[in-house]
Structures are given as C-alpha cells and as structure tokens.
Amino acid sequence: MNLSAFRVAGGIIAEEMSSSLRVLFVPVSGPSGMGEFARARSLADALKARWPDVETHFVLHREAPYARNFHHPATLVPASPTLCTAEVKRVIAQFAPQVVIFDNAGRTGALRAARRTGARVIYVSSRGRQRYKAFRLRWMRLLDEHWISYPAMIAGGATLLERLKLRLLGRPTLRFLDTVLAPADEPAAQTLIADFGMPDVLIVPGGGSQFHDSAMTPAHFARWGEAIAAHGYKVAFVAGPAYAESAHTSDRFCVLREVRGGALRVLLERSRIVLVNGGDTLLQALALGKACVAVPIAGDQPARVTRCAELGAVRAPAPQADAVLQECLDLLEDEGSRLALEEKVRAVGFADALPTLLDRIGELAAEASRATAVDQRS
C-alpha cells in the first residue's frame, strides 16, 4: 500500500511511503486460551478494513487450535512466541514491519530486534506480571506504547512508581484500553445463525479449553445454556476453537463454531443477555451496553468479575447451576431488571478503543517510514 497520507484524529499526517504498511502481531498463543489472539485478530481485521493493502503477519504457536485455517499470514513456531525468540527475530528481519505489536508475549531480544529494524514497538499487558515487565526501565526504553488491556477502574491506574518511571524516561505512552471491538460483520453473523434466528441468550465461555487454575469449564456453560433453552428461550453457544465436547442441539439451542470477531460483535449486539466468562469478551459486551451474567473460568478472572459487579455492571452469581440459571432467567423474565442493568453499564462508560488504536498504529507507521527514509538519505 503506497500511501501518501494517513488519516488520523486531528488531521492528516503527510508521509511518503516507499513500501507497504506492514504490521507484525506477536500474541501469546498456545493450546489453551485465545484472548490475546482474538484482540490481535480484531486489530488486524480492522486495519485491513481501513487500509485494504496493509500487510499483516502473525507469529503463532503451531499447536494453537485457531492457527489452523487462519485468514491472515502467519509463521507457526514450536511454542508460544515468548519461548521462540530466535524465530520471532527471524520473522522481524524478513518481514521488516513498521509496527510490531507484542501482546503479553516477547522477550527483550525480540523487542531489541524490532527496534534495530526501525520498527515502532507496542506492548500489550493484561496481567500483573506482564505489566511489571513492561515497566522495567530497560523495556520502557524499547517501547513506544504500553497498552494495558483493561480500563483503569478494573486494572488499577498507574501507581506512584509507574508514574515516576514514566516521568523519568518520558516514554512509552501508556494507554488503558476498555476493550477492542472488531468491525461488525453482519453477513458473517447471518450465515452463522442461518434459520435459527438471533438468540435471546448468547453464551461465550472463551476459547474452549479448561484452564489449569480453575475447575470451571466451557462445558458448564453449555449445560447452563441447555437449561435456559428448556425454559423456552433461544440460546446460542459460541464454541471456541479448542472446544471438542458435544452438546444437545435443538430448535432452542445451537452451537456456533469458527466465530470471528466481527460476527461475534453482531451476535452480542442482537442478543438480549450475555452469559460470559471474565475475559475480554465480557468487556466487549459491556462496551456494547449489554446485560451480562459473568462467571470466571480462569485464575485471573475472579477479581475482574468482582470489580465489574462492584461497579454494578454485571450479575456475578456463585458458579453453581441453580444460581447461574436463576440470574439469567431473572434478566430474561423481568425486562425492568434487564433495562436497569443496561443503564448501569452505560453509566459506567465502557468504550471501544479500536478507533484510537488504529489512528495510533497509522501514526507510528508513518513515523517509522519517515525515519527510515531519513536514514537511507544520510
């Protein structure tokens, strides 16, 4: 994509680019979990929608179930990219991106390799350990942007020490992201839902695998969905790529597979309530103003769900069949309760960070291209 300008918030950054816009995504990946991958996929899809000729590339664990039949170019590595620094460095050298986005993945050597090629470097953290890593001085000197993948009211604002470090170095730019919503894909959603129609309840338990630090599984969500359907409501269960268990489908309960972010957004928007885990999809649903019943499914999620409940933004029942079922039925049967919960969600003010992030990626790519052009002339 030979661009003469990037359109960004605040005007046009004029920038002659001698080569295509190239963005490399390095999300943590593996046989279980997919939140980081899903966020990176949404960003990549949105970049392609805004700049159709953009070149994207991913580095993914070859055993990740979503790595099969992925619609963006990808290099598959034998473990999570954090453990494959040599392979990541090789991809950086060959692909020569203007922007590299590490999402909870990467080691110092990979970040340095990106800087050496002239790329701008973004790091996304969603857990305390990764946030701590990104606030080490040697990493702060390598990063242009540090995105914390939850709002400050949930993740906690910058601490005194973090603020002092930012003031000392003057970098990186720190951003708290409420969530990243993929552009809506109405045709894909309609294809998925076919003759079933839009559901009363959308169930999204995550990537489909069980986490080692939790007894809760996606199968529990499927059983709850079947129970809700038995009360006469239409329920759609989004089976993540690692979900292999069978479910008893009917004219009231359907299982959806290979649901991309744009289709998921439409399904979230059209459902009456959402039964969801405590990961990224919860924040996506809240940004859309949906009434949610949230049940954590991994060790980092209980605190997040509890905080959302404290804000009055979700229903957070005990993870027991009767309690979860009753909360869902209450919201379905009592429209006043559902509307009141939606009003509280809107009052909290969760927002989609995607437009701002796309603008920033465009700005960083322009900066990288300008710096490369200067180096080539000198």
Give the positions of each predicted feature.
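Short acidic-hydrophobic, aromatic-tinged amphipathic segments that line or gate anion-handling sites
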Residues: 76-80, 256-258, 315-320
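Donor-nucleotide binding loops and adjacent catalytic segments primarily
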Residues: 191-270
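A nucleotide-sugar donor-handling region in carbohydrate enzymes
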Residues: 142-207, 240-242
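C-terminal alpha-helical cap of glycosyltransferases
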Residues: 350-378
